[in-house]
Amino acid sequence: MPKKKALTPFPYLASIVFLPWWISLSFTKSLEPWVTNWWNTGQSKTFLNDIQEKNVLERFIELEQLFLLDEMIKEYPETQIQKFHIGIHKETLQLVKMHNEDHIHIVLHFSTNIICFAILSGYYFLGNEELVILNSWVQEFLYNLSDTIKAFSILLVTDLCIGFHSPRGWELMIGSVYKDFGFAHNDQIISGLVSTFPVILDTILKYWIFHYLNRVSPSLVVIYHSMNE
């Protein structure tokens, strides 16, 4: 029985890692045609208005330079003028199609994120026994490590997450999450999160070190401060 309980967290941990990814991928593949059809038929009018007001005008900044050539075009034959307008029309359709696909992918990503969150929540509430065993494994593993290795690991993780070279990594990660949930890219909001989130983590870490590690392992705190200096 103990051996059986010891082996239980292995498939549990593997399912936590792979099952949400597999279900979200299957969901995306099966739902994409339906979402595409729904968006193209039911949301096309609203979407085109949004494109005209926000996105396409920005993409047409480069095309505005072409309209400065009107004086030259007036000297062209009628067939050349028609070709010019046909080219502009094709470019407009291409931009609308590209933005349409982006919005469809945003809907799919948002849906799969909700599914993954629901699956992980189910694991948390339904797998209490496995979580207890897994937690005991982690605590036993950390307990068997020396204080030097623990201090080195804490220092490595903190330098990676809140070190002086970490803002670029936080910017990429927050920007990716921001885009994955369908929000428009905003440099000011991302910069604000990058400048505040590591500070919050640093404060939490210092609180954890001084109020928890000082009671559990004072020698670890001494080694950590010695390595940090």
Curated annotation (Swiss-Prot):
One BP term from GO: potassium ion transport
Catalyzed reaction equations: K(+)(in) + H(+)(out) = K(+)(out) + H(+)(in)
Keyword check for Phosphoprotein: no
Record-linked InterPro entries: CemA
Principal localisation: plastid
Entry GO CC: chloroplast inner membrane
Protein topology in the membrane: Multi-pass membrane protein
Keywords on record: Antiport, Chloroplast, Hydrogen ion transport, Ion transport, Membrane, Plastid, Plastid inner membrane, Potassium, Potassium transport, Transmembrane, Transmembrane helix, Transport
GO terms for MF: antiporter activity; proton transmembrane transporter activity
Pfam family for this entry, one: CemA
Subcellular location(s) of the protein: Plastid, Chloroplast inner membrane
Spans through the membrane: 7-27, 106-126, 189-209
HAMAP family the record matches: CemA_PxcA
Role: Contributes to K(+)/H(+) antiport activity by supporting proton efflux to control proton extrusion and homeostasis in chloroplasts in a light-dependent manner to modulate photosynthesis. Prevents excessive induction of non-photochemical quenching (NPQ) under continuous-light conditions. Indirectly promotes efficient inorganic carbon uptake into chloroplasts.
Family, as annotated: Belongs to the CemA family.
UniProt protein name: Potassium/proton antiporter CemA
